[in-house]
């Protein structure tokens, strides 16, 4: 009988740890959703509808680029280094600048 009590306690401990893990994961997901919603509100304030649509298109194709671009746009706007609202042409120029900084050139010698 003593062995059965030990197994019950062990199972209860496993359940408790699993529940804590699920709760932590749910909380992290909730925080991520809140942060994404706050970014979206900020982007709606600093981008024209056309520029926001372009950013949404980028997000579909390259989500990691869109996230980096969002952070950069919010930083540029909050520091006053770019005129708000950012229109589609300005967004294109920012994208070109990012692309030229991150693009690697490969040269082959024959």
UniProtKB/Swiss-Prot annotation:
GO terms for molecular function: DNA binding. The keyword Acetylation does not apply. It comes from the Archaea. InterPro entries: DNA_bind_arc, PDCD5-like, PDCD5-like_sf. Gene3D superfamilies: PDCD5-like. The keyword DNA-binding applies. SUPFAM superfamilies: Double-stranded DNA-binding domain (SSF46950). One of its GO terms (cellular component) is cytosol. Keywords: DNA-binding. NCBIfam families: PRK04239.1. Belongs to the PDCD5 family. This is DNA-binding protein Pisl_0441. It comes from Pyrobaculum islandicum (strain DSM 4184 / JCM 9189 / GEO3).
């Amino acid at each position: 009988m003593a062995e059965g009590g030990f197994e019950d306690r062990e199972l209860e401990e496993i359940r408790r740890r699993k529940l804590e893990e699920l709760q932590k994961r749910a909380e992290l997901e909730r925080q991520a959703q809140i942060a994404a919603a706050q970014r979206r509100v900020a982007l709606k304030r600093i981008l024209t509808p056309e520029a926001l649509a372009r950013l949404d298109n980028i997000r579909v194709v390259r989500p990691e680029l869109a996230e980096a671009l969002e952070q950069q746009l919010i930083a540029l706007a909050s520091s006053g280094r770019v005129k708000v609202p950012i229109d589609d042409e300005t967004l294109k120029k920012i994208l070109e600048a990012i692309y030229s900084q991150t693009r690697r050139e490969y040269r082959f010698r024959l």
